[in-house]
């Protein structure tokens, strides 16, 4: 529960890529639907940075927090890079988005299978 506003987080799972939806219109829809927590579009390449920043700005105007989907924090990135490369990438992601007032968390992945390499990668990314 968000103690600051006494609001229960209500959100949705966002499957869109960056630059597909018009940010202001999407944020207005989220607000009208009563969303208090949104998942960003996928930040997949450096060109998407401004789109995610704009998403955070529009969400902030409406009192909505955002879970940022950034490839640099995902367990797939962890699995395919060294620990040092992953740590550097996460620090860059935090620098880019982590201090924004609308930032809630990074999405580091989903649906790992316990007892597999995927599960170990997910646990490693979460550290």
Give the predicted meaning of each segment.
Residues 1-127:
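Glycan-processing catalytic domains of CAZymes
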